[in-house]
Amino acid sequence: MKMELLIKAFIMGIVEGLTEFLPISSTGHLIIVGSFIKFTGKFATMFEIVIQLGAILAVVYYFKDKILSSLKALKPGEWGFNLWYKTFIAFLPAAIIGILTHHYIEEHLFSPFTVAIALIVGAIMMIVIEDIFGKKYKIDNMDKVSTSKAFWIGVAQVMSLFPGMSRSASTIMGGMLVGLSVRAAAEFSFFLAIPTMLAATGFELVKNITSMSLLEWEALAVGFIMSFITALIVVDKFLAYLKRHVLKPFAYYRLLVGVLMLFLIAQKIVK
């Protein structure tokens, strides 16, 4: 029993790290894989949110030089202050809506069917937005994002509260809509992930910390470690990929996964 849970945690940690920062929905993939390996239930739902902490720390480590430099320039008007202020402004919309709708989303929207629909809808949006705005960008550096543009990227992030939309996809699309290059949008998306995912992870830990067993803590540790290692590799490779390539392959992949999920649901393989 113990080894079985730890193996499942190992697998789910890798899935989280692979998918969290790609615009393909980590939630969708965790639901699919969780259904196949029979990792479901209350602990599984909490586990999938908390192991995001490993992915967050991977981003912190990847941007450590920029983060440390920004923390040395926190006087009003300095670039570090401006960066974190804009990140906070972008964080607020999803934070407020998330607090107000958390219970409803958790009880009614965390299902394979809703995730499949979100994967497909998000894929279509990615294709359309890239076709229209992909080469019309005016901002190629996240440091040049204005406060108003940061706010609208934050508004776009609200879409990611719907399971399957993908936080990464929502914020990258939002960035492109307000004039960022896909790479600049991705970098801002990763920075924005730090407060957003820390808040979500902290909220779940506070709710469940007193009711977890030692074995569940061990499973969380395994998932956390694998999520960190895998996400660190993915962030580096994804940003390098965006220097020369576009998002459409990820959109087509989302379409494929969404249709596959609908088929598996119809066959009652995934419930």
UniProtKB/Swiss-Prot annotation:
Q: What is its main location?
A: membrane
- Catalytic activities: di-trans,octa-cis-undecaprenyl diphosphate + H2O = di-trans,octa-cis-undecaprenyl phosphate + phosphate + H(+)
GO molecular function terms here? undecaprenyl-diphosphatase activity
Places the protein is found: Cell membrane
Q: Name one GO cellular component term.
A: plasma membrane
Instruction: Name residues in a coiled coil.
Output: none
Q: Where are the membrane-spanning stretches? A: 5-25, 43-63, 80-100, 109-129, 145-165, 186-206, 215-235, 246-266
Q: Which domain of life is it from?
A: Bacteria
Sorted keywords for this record are:
Antibiotic resistance, Cell membrane, Cell shape, Cell wall biogenesis/degradation, Hydrolase, Membrane, Peptidoglycan synthesis, Transmembrane, Transmembrane helix
Q: Which InterPro entries match?
A: UppP (IPR003824)
| EC number of this enzyme | 3.6.1.27
Role this protein plays? Catalyzes the dephosphorylation of undecaprenyl diphosphate (UPP). Confers resistance to bacitracin.
HAMAP family from the UniProt entry: Undec_diphosphatase (MF_01006)
Protein name (database record): Undecaprenyl-diphosphatase
Provide the species name.
Answer: Caldanaerobacter subterraneus subsp. tengcongensis (strain DSM 15242 / JCM 11007 / NBRC 100824 / MB4)
